[in-house]
Amino acid sequence: TICDTMDFWISGKRKALEATLFKVDILIIYDCAARQLSNEYNLAKAGQYILDLGPRAAVIKRGEHGATLVTRDSYFAVPAFPVLTVTDPTGAGDSFAGGFVGYLAREGDTSDTGLKRAMIRGSVMASFNVEDFSVRRLEMLENHEIESRLESFMEMLRF
């Protein structure tokens, strides 16, 4: 089970949120919300706090700085895919989450390696989102564009 939360639930329905997190496998959360939930500025500590609430993994979205996957045994940070023209960042985090969850649903691989691959997919999907307003770019997106950007991103990350 995957959950995405925000400050509204943290400040307004904290007990219900914590009860929900106990039943969740993966929490996807923005960095500011992770800090609010944990009362920790350090995101590594915030991630560990989240794991103590029940999830086996936390995905902390960090906006233009990418995202971090936190598990009991590891941390994995993925940068945001570099985009030359950012038109509107609204919804990029949701597009990241959609790419992440979509990859896991399609592949069925929730191992640490599978989660890392899902992080890469999420970053790529978010990069398309910021290229236009609303969901326009995503609506006209073709699979070969995704695959091409994934290949480019993997090459950037290799050294």
Predicted stretch roles:
Residues T1-Y49, R56, G66:
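Conserved beta-alpha-beta core of the PfkB/ribokinase-like small-molecule kinase fold
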Residues L43-F159:
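Conserved phosphate-binding/catalytic region of the ribokinase-like
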